[in-house]
């Protein structure tokens, strides 16, 4: 059985497996709680036991299971039904279930492979002039040139990002006026790097590479583990910077109408 709930607590979420999906769910909960319509939580229950939690933040679905719990084929069938009703733009879940779910909803979704990376520190923080508290409009100006989904959602992006930054759940970095990177969450001692971009006229000059390495060393010095995800064509790039592959998963993305 899968049912929506507003009784999620931090204690409940602490019982989930320690992975990216759990940290994503926690970051949403810690940012907004359970009182907003744009953030919904569901419990997966089998044989009277809670086996997992689902969050749907705007149009992104995140799924994680409790420690020592697994999802049966019947639970995945029911999950596919929930997906068909909600039709999220993106679905992320543990690697052991991603392709199984895709086999059930593949008519509406594409399945893309990702590699998860962890930063390997050399304990050498470069001397760089990085703005750790940039104006978010300056960050947006750069991101908008690389991410159409952000470009077309300025108010939503600004509201959510500033909300999370104020609560210490996210942070943006700016190198000069040309390269930026954002920490998408800082949860349970892990920082997830995402949304790295450089303005077109400065690309190819290794700005993003230098900023990512600096962020890795800076956050490691503060005691955080630094992670990021990359699609197959970017794997060697992150390995060269100093990131080590630690896992693979599959992300489901809803097909656009003309596919």
Where are these regions (language model features)?
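Conserved GNAT acetyl-CoA-binding A-motif
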Residues: 85-95, 219-231
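A mid-sequence, solvent-exposed acidic-amphipathic segment
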Residues: 137-192, 197
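Active-site rim helix/loop that mediates acceptor-substrate recognition in acyltransferases
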Residues: 20-41, 46, 148-172
């Amino acid at each position: 059985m899968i049912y929506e709930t507003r009784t999620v607590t931090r204690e409940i979420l602490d019982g989930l497996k320690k992975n990216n999906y759990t940290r994503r769910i926690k970051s949403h909960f810690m940012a907004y709680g359970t009182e907003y319509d744009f953030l919904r939580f569901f419990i997966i229950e089998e044989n009277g036991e809670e086996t997992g939690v689902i969050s749907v933040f705007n149009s992104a679905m995140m799924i994680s299971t409790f420690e020592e719990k697994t999802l049966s084929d019947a639970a995945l069938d029911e999950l596919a039904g929930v997906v068909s009703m909600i039709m999220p733009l993106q679905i992320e879940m543990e690697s052991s279930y991603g392709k199984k779910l895709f086999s059930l909803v593949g008519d509406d979704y594409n399945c893309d492979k990702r590699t998860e990376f962890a930063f390997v520190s050399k304990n050498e923080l470069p001397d760089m002039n990085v703005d750790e508290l940039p104006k978010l409009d300056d960050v947006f100006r750069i991101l908008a040139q690389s991410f159409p989904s952000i470009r077309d959602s300025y108010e939503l992006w600004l509201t959510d990002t500033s909300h999370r930054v104020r609560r210490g759940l996210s942070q943006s970095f700016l190198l000069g006026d040309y390269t930026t990177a954002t920490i998408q969450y800082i949860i349970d001692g892990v920082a997830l790097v995402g949304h790295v971009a450089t303005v077109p006229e400065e690309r190819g000059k290794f700005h993003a590479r230098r900023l990512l390495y600096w962020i890795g060393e800076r956050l490691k010095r503060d005691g955080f583990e630094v992670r990021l995800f990359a699609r197959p064509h970017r794997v060697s790039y992150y390995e060269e910077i100093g990131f080590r592959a630690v896992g693979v998963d599959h992300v489901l993305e809803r097909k656009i109408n003309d596919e």
